[in-house]
Amino acid sequence: MEAKAAPKPAASGACSVSAEETEKWMEEAMHMAKEALENTEVPVGCLMVYNNEVVGKGRNEVNQTKNATRHAEMVAIDQVLDWCRQSGKSPSEVFEHTVLYVTVEPCIMCAAALRLMKIPLVVYGCQNERFGGCGSVLNIASADLPNTGRPFQCIPGYRAEEAVEMLKTFYKQENPNAPKSKVRKKECQKS
């Protein structure tokens, strides 16, 4: 397992996490990613942790819901909003002190949502070289974007190899929900 040094507090001073906390929460995020894989979803899992409590967690639900926006981070954001309603907490106060642990770099859509919610810190596993919003494709996390929330700190590479292996496993299998025109053609094998 790859271990990274404990993150420094975010620029706003809103939060910091230890190496032990990072390991604990990333283990649970990996479990969520495995659950996604078992349900024929892209294996991405995440947790949103506020005051050392999981207030939202998610895994990709795109195939299950047939809704392309149901990425792990968006599912978790919805859970945090529900938790805030039930707890009588201000969502802005909670998000500004929440750390996101996610197995894969958030895509551009999710990075924009995290920025709008003013999440100060994102710890992620592997890069998302096709859709990454934290530097791999665009850097939504730290770009100078007026009126779009607050930039956030990223700590990449935590258990990246494990996250990549799960993605490879997913992309080797058939997607039963794919349109017929998109299904990979299997090569005929000669005897």
From Swiss-Prot:
Cellular component aspect of the GO annotation: nucleoplasm
CDD domains reported in the protein's UniProt record: nucleoside_deaminase (cd01285)
Annotated Pfam families: MafB19-deam
The keyword Phosphoprotein belongs to this UniProt entry's keyword annotation: no
Catalysis: reaction(s): adenosine(34) in tRNA + H2O + H(+) = inosine(34) in tRNA + NH4(+)
Family: Belongs to the cytidine and deoxycytidylate deaminase family. ADAT2 subfamily.
Protein name: tRNA-specific adenosine deaminase 2
Protein source organism: Homo sapiens
